């Protein structure tokens, strides 16, 4: 199949994603918009400066800790702990207006070839266990996953073959799932940067029910706020080809990591095998 937006044949190995052509806009329209933006920036900037002066005086009046105003010190400490613990090299993927979403092509059928009994399907989760102990196993129905907070996001899905599509996804954050069901820690406590670092599993493995497709993630990616256990695409329930009943969506990574039809999730102390990494692609597959 030839895809017009890709200059690389699909079989030629990893291709860099290309920027997609956007709707052409006249110079005049661009200038009008720029002028509006500048006016708004002045206004927003002025309000921010005022808030800054008021806030700054409040901060300077507060008692000092470590040569820094107390409230500032505490915020920096808390954020610093979280950031250094989990989001050292992280950013957020750009989100788009929902109206930009387009149908996503079907790509990749490993692990989807056998019939899936919708009634029999359960998400199996293997908890993180200290070495030499038997891990906890817990089963979840789709309804239990759907009972968690629903998050919707419109992000760009990028396949390593060189094409991309903006898609609206809905599901639950893997981090929210783990807040309710604390299976990523050996203590069974929710993820918390104040816990000893060894309490948290460094890796996650996701495998289809038939074990034909499998993905490995670092825990930082699994806990990222845009990493979803996803059950809806472009406003409709996921179809089997797109990974029903549950797939992974993690928009800072290429499509190869967005495993469709998740059967088992396991929290591990070793980097798990990954379908495309064992075939020569980068294990992290970030972009
Ligand atoms: N189970 C499973 N998940 C998979 C694949 C696969 O072959 N099997 N292919 C991956 C690749 S390479 C891509 S680009 C996306 C495509 O998702 P889509 O079919 O919903 O577009 O699924 C990913 N997840
Ligand atoms: Mo892909």
Where are the model-predicted features located?
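Acidic, glycine-rich loop-and-strand cores that form catalytic or ligand-binding grooves
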Residues: 182-212, 219
């Amino acid at each position: 199949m030839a895809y017009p937006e890709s200059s690389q044949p699909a079989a030629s190995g990893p291709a860099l994603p290309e920027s997609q052509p956007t709707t052409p806009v006249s110079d005049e329209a661009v200038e009008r918009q720029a002028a509006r933006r500048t006016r708004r920036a002045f206004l927003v900037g002025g309000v921010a400066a005022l808030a800054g002066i008021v806030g700054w005086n409040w901060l300077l009046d507060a008692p000092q800790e470590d040569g820094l105003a107390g409230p500032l010190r505490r915020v920096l400490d808390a954020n610093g702990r979280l950031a250094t613990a989990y989001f050292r090299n992280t950013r957020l993927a750009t989100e788009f207006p929902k109206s930009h979403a387009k149908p996503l092509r079907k790509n990749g059928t490993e692990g989807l070839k056998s019939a899936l009994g919708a009634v029999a399907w359960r998400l199996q989760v293997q908890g993180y266990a200290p070495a030499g102990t038997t891990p906890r196993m817990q089963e979840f129905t789709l309804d239990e996953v759907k009972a968690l907070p629903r998050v919707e996001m419109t992000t760009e899905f990028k396949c390593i073959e060189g094409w991309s599509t903006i898609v609206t996804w809905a599901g639950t954050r893997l981090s929210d799932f783990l807040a309710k069901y604390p299976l990523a820690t050996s203590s069974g406590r929710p993820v918390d940067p104040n816990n000893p670092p060894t309490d948290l599993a460094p890796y996650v493995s996701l495998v289809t029910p038939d074990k034909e497709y499998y993905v490995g993630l670092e825990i930082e990616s699994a806990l990222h706020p845009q990493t979803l256990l996803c059950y809806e695409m472009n406003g409709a329930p996921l179809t089997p080809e797109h990974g029903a009943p549950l797939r992974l969506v993690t928009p800072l990574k290429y499509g190869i990591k967005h495993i469709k039809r998740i059967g088992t999730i396991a929290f591990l102390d070793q980097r798990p095998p990954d379908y495309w990494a064992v075939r020569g692609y980068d294990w992290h597959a970030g972009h």
